[in-house]
Amino acid sequence: MSFPYSLKPFNTFGVEQSCLSMIEVHSKAELQSTCLSLYQSKRPMLVLGGGSNIVFTDDFNGTVVRVLTKGISCSEDGTHFYLAVEAGENWHELVHFSLNQDMPGLENLALIPGTVGAAPIQNIGAYGVELCDICDWVEYLDLESGNLLRLTADECEFAYRESIFKGCLRDKAVITAVGLRLPKAWQPKLAYGPLQSFNAETVTPREIFERVCEVRSEKLPNPEELGNAGSFFKNPIVSAATYMQLAAHFPSIVGYAQPNGEVKLAAGWLIEHAGLKGFALGNAGVHAKQALVLVNLGHATGQDICRLALHVIARVNEVFGVKLEAEPRIMGLTGETSLDV
C-alpha cells in the first residue's frame, strides 16, 4: 500500500512516517464538513494541530486533517477580559498577543508548543498555572450528531493532564474553539522554581513571560534542531505517606504539595536520579539538559522513542517504586495505540 503524504514536517519529533491522505482546513465550516464526512465513512481519521504531542510508530492508514483555522475575538466586562480563539491558532502566539493587548494571565504558559485546540485535551500547564484556571468554555464538533456544542470549564472534567476529551468524548469530538477568561485584577503566580525570586508586589506580566521563555529555551531543545515533544512524562502524583517514605531515602527529592494532600513529584528529577540523564538507546535519547524530554538523535523511529520511554519507566519504577506515564499520544497504523508497540 502506498502512503504518499509525509508526516515528518508535521510532528515535532521529526519521525519519518506517512499517511494515506491529508486535508488542510482553514475555516470552521470546512473543519466541520471534512471531519463529519470522514467520521461517517468510518475511515481512520487523525485531527492534527501542531504535532507537538504525538509519536508516530507506523504509517497512518487514513486521513490526517490539519487544523489551520485562525481568529481571536476579545471582549470585556467590569472584572474580566474574554478571548474566543479558533482551534488552529498557535498557543504561544496567543500568549504573546494577550500580553500585547494588556490582557495578562497566560504568561506562565508561554512557549508551550502546539495549537489552541489541543490545549484543553490534556489541560496544558506549566509553572503553577493550568488551562483549567483560565478556561471559560470549549466549543467542539460532536461527530455523532454533527452539531457544534459548548461545554463550560466545569463540564470539561479537567484534571492534571486530563479532560473529558481524553475520556468519554475521546474519538467523538473535534475541538473547534476555546474561550478564555482572564481576571482584570491580575495576580502573579510565582510558586514554581525560577519564578520564586520575583517580588509579587513589583513583578510585571512581561517579566514573568520573559523568564518563562528564557528557562524553557535553556532546558527544552528546539525541535527543528533536535526532534522532541517537550515533556514526555507526566509528573506522578503520590500520597503524602509515599512521599515521606521516598524523602527518607532520597532527601533531595522534589515534590509539590497538592490541595488534596497528595504530592506531585518532579518526573525529571526521578529520571535524572535514576541515572538516565543523557542516556541513549539507538537513535533516541534522554536530553542531557532536561531529563523529562526525550529526543530524536537523528533518524529515530517512533518505535525507538517508545522503547526508550519504556526503559525509562521501568528504571524509575525499579529505583523509586513510582510508575511514570507518557504524555504524548502514540499513533499506529489505524489510530491511537499504547506505548507497548
From Swiss-Prot:
It is found in: Cytoplasm. The active site is at 161, 231 (proton donor), 327. Its main location: cytoplasm. Residues 13-185 form the FAD-binding PCMH-type domain. Pathway: Cell wall biogenesis; peptidoglycan biosynthesis. It catalyses: UDP-N-acetyl-alpha-D-muramate + NADP(+) = UDP-N-acetyl-3-O-(1-carboxyvinyl)-alpha-D-glucosamine + NADPH + H(+). Disulfide bonds: none annotated. InterPro entries: FAD-bd_PCMH, FAD-bd_PCMH-like_sf, FAD-bd_PCMH_sub1, FAD-bd_PCMH_sub2, MurB, MurB_C, MurB_C_sf, Oxid_FAD_bind_N. The keyword Flavoprotein applies. Its EC number is 1.3.1.98. Its cofactor is FAD. SUPFAM superfamilies: FAD-binding/transporter-associated domain-like, Uridine diphospho-N-Acetylenolpyruvylglucosamine reductase, MurB, C-terminal domain. One of its GO terms (cellular component) is cytosol. Keywords: Cell cycle, Cell division, Cell shape, Cell wall biogenesis/degradation, Cytoplasm, FAD, Flavoprotein, NADP, Oxidoreductase, Peptidoglycan synthesis. It is an enzyme of class 1 (oxidoreductase). GO terms for biological process: cell division; cell wall organization; peptidoglycan biosynthetic process; regulation of cell shape. One of its GO terms (molecular function) is UDP-N-acetylmuramate dehydrogenase activity. Cell wall formation. PANTHER family: UDP-N-ACETYLENOLPYRUVOYLGLUCOSAMINE REDUCTASE (PTHR21071:SF4). Belongs to the MurB family. This is UDP-N-acetylenolpyruvoylglucosamine reductase. It comes from Shewanella sp. (strain MR-4). The gene is murB.
